[in-house]
Amino acid sequence: FRPALAAAPRRISPGLRVNPDYAEVAVALYNPCAPGSRLGIRRAQFEGESLAGIEGLHFHCLCEQDADVLERVLARVEEQFAPFFGGLRWINFGGGHHITRPGYDVDRLVRIVAGFRARYPHLQVVLEPGEAVALHTGWLVASVLDIVEADLPVAILDTSAEAHMPDVLAMPYRPEVEGAGKPGEKAWTCRLAGLTCLAGDTIGTYSFDAPLQVGDRVVFADM
């Protein structure tokens, strides 16, 4: 990429993504440091002499996590890559920080960043809050198209897990539904499903105070 950088019409500060082979992400699909991950250069393949012109390092090892996990990840990053910090200008701590989530330990994050800056005062620290910027800011409003009887009543909605909320199928992830509870928690339990031909286009099982009817609105929070 060096020829492309040299030919760029504006100045670019190039960096490399590194992989410290350490993360605490429970779902393998979202774990950038899982065995066999293609994301980031591992220490064993890291050649210091190849850093000419490189101004920063980037690591992304978190997924919806708190500052305590960042602290442990950062310790691994320093252990492996600190010898290369001297010639750099910046380091990017990546995303996955749930900074705006209630209960997030902001004071601990401040201490972590301040401590790192004290150890490496020449490095600018970059954070990518990612999802935290938009946490709890959007809703998806669906309507009930039909009720199908199976082992449980199935409410067919005019939305789709596959098309509109793929994390439901990938993680799996259970979206929050306004006014709904866990299965059996409220008077009527049903399965919410999409309208596609995918057999597994199922959003989850929820309970409601009263049976859903065709035309009722179902509001998914934190979309």
Name the predicted role of every residue range.
Residues 90-92, 98, 109-133:
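Oxyanion-binding "anion nests"
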Residues 23-24, 63-66, 98-101, 133-136, ...:
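Flexible loop/turn segments at secondary-structure boundaries
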Residues 58-61, 88-94, 194-196, 216, ...:
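Glycine-rich anion-binding loop/nest that anchors nucleotide
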Residues 17-21, 96, 160, 195:
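Generic beta-structure capping elements
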Residues 21, 35, 62, 98, ...:
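Residue-level marker of positions within ordered structural domains that often coincide
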Residues 1-92, 103-105, 112-115, 119, ...:
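Active-site-proximal beta-alpha core segment in soluble small-molecule metabolic enzymes
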Residues 28-31, 56-59, 95, 126, ...:
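Generic, low-specificity signal for short hydrophobic/alpha-helical stretches with a mild N-terminal bias
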Residues 112, 124-223:
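Charged (often Lys/Glu-rich) extended helix/loop segments that serve as interaction or gating elements
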